[in-house]
């Protein structure tokens, strides 16, 4: 829990700067590249004998090599992350950043797990449900899980709505077992 609070604070700080500079998309994209780079070279970036500025300079060189760049405020953000040895929470910072950005646009992030690819009509029904429930437009992050058999699991605003066949089977099984115990 502590790391998620830390990640949320860093994400909020970066988003505030990005909004002020009108660079929310750019910062999100660069942060995603930095997270990928960190995950691929984790051993190097977690080496305590290398200073924070050198870590950030290496990231800067890599970003420049792929044809992108970032400004001084983003560089300062990364330097603080590495000075405080918080680089291990970069993936969580990215996730919080994405979600906070969506919320700042008066939308709601929704994690959707389905048994198969949804049709436009099915997606519209789910969109309408989420709008009715949250009073905001959803932004879906979808993943396929065939173990659901059919149906969907919707996660938003800290709540989970399980409308999957696997979820219903679990509920029926639980109720049957509870009756046997009594």
Swiss-Prot record:
SUPFAM superfamilies recorded: N-terminal domain of the delta subunit of the F1F0-ATP synthase
Pfam families: OSCP (PF00213)
InterPro entries reported in the protein's UniProt record: ATP_synth_OSCP/delta_N_sf (IPR026015), ATPase_OSCP/dsu (IPR000711)
Keywords: ATP synthesis, Cell inner membrane, Cell membrane, CF(1), Hydrogen ion transport, Ion transport, Membrane, Transport
GO molecular function: proton-transporting ATP synthase activity, rotational mechanism
Membrane topology according to the record: Peripheral membrane protein
GO cellular component, one term: plasma membrane
Subcellular location, record wording: Cell inner membrane
Family, similarity comment: Belongs to the ATPase delta chain family.
Function, in words: F(1)F(0) ATP synthase produces ATP from ADP in the presence of a proton or sodium gradient. F-type ATPases consist of two structural domains, F(1) containing the extramembraneous catalytic core and F(0) containing the membrane proton channel, linked together by a central stalk and a peripheral stalk. During catalysis, ATP synthesis in the catalytic domain of F(1) is coupled via a rotary mechanism of the central stalk subunits to proton translocation.
PANTHER family from the UniProt entry: ATP SYNTHASE DELTA CHAIN (PTHR11910)
Subunit structure: F-type ATPases have 2 components, F(1) - the catalytic core - and F(0) - the membrane proton channel. F(1) has five subunits: alpha(3), beta(3), gamma(1), delta(1), epsilon(1). F(0) has three main subunits: a(1), b(2) and c(10-14). The alpha and beta chains form an alternating ring which encloses part of the gamma chain. F(1) is attached to F(0) by a central stalk formed by the gamma and epsilon chains, while a peripheral stalk is formed by the delta and b chains.
Protein name according to UniProt: ATP synthase subunit delta
Gene from which this protein is expressed: atpH
């Amino acid at each position: 829990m502590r790391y998620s609070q830390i990640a949320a604070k860093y994400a909020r700080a970066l988003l505030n700067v990005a909004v002020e500079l009108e660079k929310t998309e750019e910062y999100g994209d660069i942060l995603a590249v930095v997270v990928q780079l960190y995950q691929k070279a984790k051993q190097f970036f977690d080496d305590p004998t290398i200073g924070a500025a050198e870590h950030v300079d290496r990231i800067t060189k890599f970003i420049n090599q792929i044809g992108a760049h970032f400004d001084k405020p983003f560089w300062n953000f990364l330097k603080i992350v590495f000075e405080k040895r918080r680089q291990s929470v970069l993936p969580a910072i990215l996730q919080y950043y994405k979600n906070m950005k969506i919320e700042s646009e008066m939308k709601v992030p929704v994690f959707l797990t389905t048994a198969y690819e949804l049709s436009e009509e099915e997606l519209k029904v789910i969109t309408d449900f989420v709008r009715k429930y949250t009073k905001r437009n959803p932004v879906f992050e979808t993943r396929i899980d065939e173990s659901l058999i059919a149906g969907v699991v919707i996660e938003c605003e800290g709540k989970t709505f399980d409308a999957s066949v696997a979820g219903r089977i679990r509920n029926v099984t639980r109720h049957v077992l509870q009756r046997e115990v009594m």
